[in-house]
Every structure is written in C-alpha cells, then in structure tokens.
Amino acid sequence: MPHSDELDAGNVLAVENLNIAFMQDQQKIAAVRNLSFSLQRGETLAIVGESGSGKSVTALALMRLLEQAGGLVQCDKMLLQRRSREVIELSEQSAAQMRHVRGADMAMIFQEPMTSLNPVFTVGEQIAESIRLHQNASREEAMVEAKRMLDQVRIPEAQTILSRYPHQLSGGMRQRVMIAMALSCRPAVLIADEPTTALDVTIQAQILQLIKVLQKEMSMGVIFITHDMGVVAEIADRVLVMYQGEAVETGTVEQIFHAPQHPYTRALLAAVPQLGAMKGLDYPRRFPLISLEHPAKQEPPIEQKTVVDGEPVLRVRNLVTRFPLRSGLLNRVTREVHAVEKVSFDLWPGETLSLVGESGSGKSTTGRALLRLVESQGGEIIFNGQRIDTLSPGKLQALRRDIQFIFQDPYASLDPRQTIGDSIIEPLCVHGLLPGKDAAARVAWLLERVGLLPEHAWRYPHEFSGGQRQRICIARALALNPKVIIADEAVSALDVSIRGQIINLLLDLQRDFGIAYLFISHDMAVVERISHRVAVMYLGQIVEIGPRRAVFENPQHPYTRKLLAAVPVAEPSRQRPQRVLLSDDLPSNIHLRGEEVAAVLLQCVGPGHYVAQPQSEYAFMRR
C-alpha cells in the first residue's frame, strides 16, 4: 500500500518510535526504545555507540530480519521510498514482498562476512544471483557485472576470484565481496554494519571513497553503523549516538565532534585513539576508559620495561607458505598463491610485535602457520628452543597450551551448539588442568575480566553482539595462561570503550605474567598504542621492521608511509584530500608453479630498525 503523502520531501527513509525487544527466561528484554530518525537521498547517517547499544538490531529491524530470530518489533512508522519512487510501509510487507525489497531497494553489508556468505557457492555465483534476481540479467551478463563490481572494490585477479569459495579468501577480501554484492543492484538505501572493520586502512579508504562515488551517482542514502570515529568524521553528514538502546544525541558531524552535548558523546570522542598520540614515548600506554562521571580520565602511561632480556620465546626463520591453485581439464596445480615468502622475526617474552599490512599481505597466514593451522613449505619455527614445525600432531597439541590464537571472526570460531561457558571450559578440559567446580569459577573470573557477567556463561553465541562474541574468544584464549598469544584482528570488532578495556587487560596480563603477543592488526592507532616493535608486510614479505617509535615517527619504506597516510582522522575539518583510488593497479601474489620471487633484502637504518633495500622493492609503489 503506497504512503507517498506521509514521507517528507527529500527523505528516502523515515522511522518513528521504533521499539525492539527479545524474550529471555520468559521476560521481555528491551534492546531499542523509542528510536526515531530519518534519512535523506544522498545523505550518510552514522549510528555510533558501544557494543550492545542497539545499533545492529536497528539495522536488522529495518531489513525485517528480526522476526525469524524471535525479535519483537513495534514501530509507529517505517517508511521507505523505493527506486521506483513508490513509498511503502516496511512493517506491512509480506515475506515475499520483502524478498523483492531486499537487495534491489535496500541492501545491507553485514559485520561478519564469513557467516554472511554461503560456503558451498563460489563468490561469482553469489554476486550474480542478486544481479539476476533484481535486474533480470542472464547468467553471462550477471557474471560480467559481478567481475566489474569486484574490480570496483579493488580485488586483484577478479576473474580468478569469481571461481573461488569464501573460505579461500582472507577476511578483508571476504568483506570486499560482501560490499560488491550489496552495491551490485544500486539500492536506494544502503545499510552498512561495520563494513570496513575487517579492512586495512588503505582498502578502507578506497571503500569509503567508492561508497561516496556510488552514493553521489545514485542519490543513495547510507546508514553507516560503526565504532570508528575516524570513519564517522570522514564519511558522515549526520550522526546518531546510541547508548543502552536509546538515542542520546543527534546532529551534524561538525556539531557532534566540535560541540558534543551529552556526557556519553564526550566520553566516546575522548576515548578515540589518535595516531601520533604516542610521539616521544617508548613503551605501550593504557587507553583511557569511558566514564560518564569522569569523561576520558587519562591513565598514566606504562613506563615499566616488560620485555625480558635473554633468548626469544619464538624464533621464525625464512617461513614460506603457499597455496595451490588448480585449473584445466585435469584439475592440475598450475599456479600458487605466495602467501608468505621467507619471513623471519624474533619474539621476546613480555614483548608485543605487531604485524601490519593490507588485506592479503600474509599477516593472518603467518600467524596460522606458527600454530600449524596451515602447513608451511619451508623455514623454521622455534618455540623455547624447540623446533615445532616438524612436531608430530600429538606433541603439537601439548604445545598449543602455551601458544593460543584469537581469531578474526568470533562467530565462526565459537560452536553455536555450546554455551559460551562450555566453550571457555573446553581447553581446560582438553588439557586436564582444572576439575569441574574450579573450572566454573575460572570461567566466571575470565568473563568478568573481559567485561561480561558470570551469568552470561549459560547463553549461546547467537545471543551476543559481535563485540561481545570477540570478548568471549579473548576469554577462552586467556584460560590456559599461555606464554604466547597470536591475536588476529582481536579488537577490530570492538567499540572504542571495550577495545580500550581489552587492550588494558592484555597489557596487565603482559606485565603480570610476561606474555608475548603477536598482534596482527590493520588499526594503526591501536598498533601504535600497544606495540614494542612493528613489522610491515607487503605481498607476503616483511619490508620494514623495527621499534614502534622508529617505524611510526620515522617510517623509511614508501609502503609504510602509505599505510600511515591512509589512517582516517577523527576530525571532520581534517579530511584526507581527494585521491584517485578506484582505478589503481593492485599487484598480485599469484605466480606460476615453480616460479620464485626475489627475496626482500633488509638493511639496517637504525638500532633494530630494518628496511627493504631499494633494489628489492619490485614495483612496491606502482600504484
């Protein structure tokens, strides 16, 4: 039923008095209360707030995806202007009608790409399906358009990626596939739920610009859900701040950043990590914690030395990891992905070494290879003087008690059939460390340390927000008191307050127990805050490594400078200058089988600071 006379001129979406609740233990728990907002054509509305504040469930309610999950949604008005200019009341649409609205008129980019993509279909089939459904295109036309969309989101070897499955792509590449799928039908409204969380800063900058270009081209309204205030400053026209299910402040991006009125908004802004805040400091520094009573009370920097002199706890030499690509009638291996190429580094007890680089640079593969989650084709991995890359599976399991992994995708790494208490207890049971009663107490302590409640132990993963699920994964990794923790984008899904709490927790544990961290991240501001040393990876190789202060304050390699220049600044008046990003040529790390790539040769430019020699920078900055 049309409602064209009820939607104000210029608006493409209007929501009035939205209330969302869930039933728990026969009680109605409110998730969103009395939320009202509108969205104009060509406008970007950023919805910000802490994990569990109601941001994502608001988006799911607009897409009518909460009913199947048991959500109770009530709304006085939820109007959408379709691409055809017809105005509809979303709450009145049948399930069949909503299938035509989703994708064509209103699309959503979800936070966790691995759980949003179908594992049994190729990337090309999934993008083409939406194009064929909403644009009446043939299969051939849809695949051509799918390839064009992958090119637009700057995926290298786009034609090859079309035939890949989601598990064969990195987290950042999967997110780019999701973005390509959402934008393929040119919707009237795009809802982006943390769309750049899994992306490195350079790809994030390119995706933000791509969304801006398509938004201008199609007069598309964008609802941008994020916890990254730097992204908000760069892309938003208006900002809606949510706290505990309610809108506490709304205004233009300049008003929110320069004259915030609500104490929570002021605390949120003050807690944002700023690149360059560590200038002149040698050691990691704690984050300020969000407090409504004392907004952004800064804790003193950690100046004690946590790195222990002596032998490294982990030593990696010339690590090589490659993945085969099959083709042809006989399905033979003809090419290989050179994911990691002759990588070497040491990790000392009590040290945090951060691996940074673009999506597909080999950061995550390096971390997984250290635990033999992927097999390496060369090199040595030595832990506490023992070579572990040749250990039998039985001996390797005992070793994993001392080396724990925090994965990038929290939902995919938790068993949906287990309560989170059982998931945290499981490693304790596998290694026979604690009896049942003591294990339960340990779980309660761990949940409290990561900002959750002991009673949460009886809930299941789907009952938590993305940020809460990541905290659960961190609690599980800490259960065994490991000597080394490999954290793969461990805090990228967390809002600034919880991220600060988790980083502070990791620093406390490092100080108390001498834990060494291999911190894999694309968030340069967090890396600057937590790291003792930083290694920059590009196309599977380390091109710069050194003390954090030297790498950030005096970057030598052009790629390192490029990464730092791409970091969004949480200041609307200091947006990055417009750059041509959409037609850049992205080099590929796929080579013919048997083809060898010249090794990067590092030269010393300062105490502990090494940079790739110019002759080995083979077209690093072609773009």
From Swiss-Prot:
ATP binds at residues 49-56, 357-364. It catalyses: glutathione(out) + ATP + H2O = glutathione(in) + ADP + phosphate + H(+). CDD domains: ABC_NikE_OppD_transporters. It comes from the Bacteria. The keyword Nucleus does not apply. Signal peptide: none annotated. Belongs to the ABC transporter superfamily. Glutathione importer (TC 3.A.1.5.11) family. NCBIfam families: PRK10261.1, PRK10419.1, PRK11308.1. This is Glutathione import ATP-binding protein GsiA. It comes from Shigella boydii serotype 4 (strain Sb227).
